[in-house]
């Protein structure tokens, strides 16, 4: 038996890739970004293994991999490969695959496509309601990263399932995030009890409570809810803005010359004398609701002295889509809170919620 094939048989974390590589991964998570290449196969026929390897021919396993563009481990767990990253696809019966050269659909034990679609439905059930409150309780940045992986898998698979009967356990890290519903439920019930409302006992009642009761003017401000649920994380997907401001972009209703992002910021801050001016601007920010009404879209952030400045694009004026506004977040060492803007493109970070 070929040495690489023996390593594959000895370790479930060793995968055969559809480009001939044999790789070892640290753990078989839904989205594998990095792995160790331990060798490459140059032939893909029955000379690689003996008749006891599968019930059929090992060559047929490679035919399956190449025709379906899938990578496999010894237990039949399959991954799609895209840009050298691997996305979990499902599990197939390799013994059955080794006996045939076509008709693979009925040989799959399950498809991750179905599992991930079920995950999307479960998480979206909450996120599509009161975005500001629910994002805080579910640690939006972490969940959004995982849902991004889900969307990638769905795109690779070319569609999605509506199978509502699946009970296959979703990966532990996502389940742990979804498990935070219990803690959030306690916060909501505490708020409702203080206001003389009935407590909620299940997910549907929680959704109703979010829709009907958790409004700032009746219960409490969103910022306080965020503090109680412990959302303190700066969005991971927010990029640092460096280099020149794009041509044609307007800055505070004036055309920007050849400014860098830092220079554009200083042009505004210099009106109030440098860093001390930025502190003054923090105190002068208009109320949250007025800013939210402008439907700002977060573009990225600038590091300026000890501050993190969030740059947002305004969508208020249809003839001025490139208008940018600078929103002043709190000190970088302080806690930041986030919620999705009215256009649901956000989230936007506001320092004054602290």
UniProtKB/Swiss-Prot annotation:
Q: Which domain of life is it from?
A: Viruses
What this chain does, per the entry, is described as: Involved in transmission of the virus by the vector nematode Paratrichodorus pachydermus.
Organism, per UniProt?
A: Tobacco rattle virus (isolate PpK20) (TRV)
Q: Under which name does UniProt file this protein? A: 40 kDa protein
* Subunit composition and interactions: Interacts with capsid protein; this interaction may play a role in vector transmission of the virus.
């Amino acid at each position: 038996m070929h040495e690489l094939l023996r390593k594959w048989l000895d370790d479930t974390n060793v995968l055969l890739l559809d480009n001939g590589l044999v790789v070892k991964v640290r753990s078989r998570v839904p989205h594998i970004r990095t792995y160790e290449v331990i060798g490459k196969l140059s032939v893909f026929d029955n000379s690689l293994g003996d008749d006891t390897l599968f019930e059929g021919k090992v060559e047929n396993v490679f035919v399956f991999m190449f025709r379906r563009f899938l990578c496999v481990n010894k237990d039949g767990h399959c991954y799609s490969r895209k840009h050298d990253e691997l996305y979990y696809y499902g599990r197939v019966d390799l013994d059955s695959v080794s006996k045939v050269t076509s008709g693979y659909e009925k040989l799959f034990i399950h498809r991750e496509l179905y599992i991930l679609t079920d995950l999307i439905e479960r998480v979206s059930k909450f996120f599509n309601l009161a975005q500001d409150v629910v994002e805080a309780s579910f640690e939006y940045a972490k969940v959004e990263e995982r849902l991004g992986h889900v969307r990638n898998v769905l795109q690779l698979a070319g569609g999605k399932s509506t199978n509502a009967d699946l009970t296959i356990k979703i990966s532990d890290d996502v389940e742990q995030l979804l498990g935070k519903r219990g803690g959030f439920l306690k916060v909501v019930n505490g708020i409702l009890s203080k206001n003389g409302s009935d407590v909620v006992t299940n997910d549907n009642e929680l959704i109703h409570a979010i829709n009907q009761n958790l409004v700032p003017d009746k219960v409490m401000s969103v910022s306080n809810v965020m503090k109680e649920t412990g959302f303190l994380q700066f969005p991971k997907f927010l990029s640092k803005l460096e280099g020149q401001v794009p041509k044609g972009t307007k800055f505070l209703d004036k055309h920007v010359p050849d400014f860098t992002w830092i220079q554009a910021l200083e042009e505004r801050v210099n009106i109030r004398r440098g860093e001390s001016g930025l502190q003054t601007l923090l105190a002068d920010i208009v109320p949250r609701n007025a800013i939210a009404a402008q439907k700002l879209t977060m573009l990225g952030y600038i590091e300026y002295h000890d501050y993190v400045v969030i740059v947002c694009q305004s969508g208020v004026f249809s003839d001025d889509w490139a208008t940018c506004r600078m929103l002043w977040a709190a000190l970088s060492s302080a806690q930041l809170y986030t919620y999705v803007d009215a256009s649901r493109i956000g989230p936007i970070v506001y320092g004054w919620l602290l």
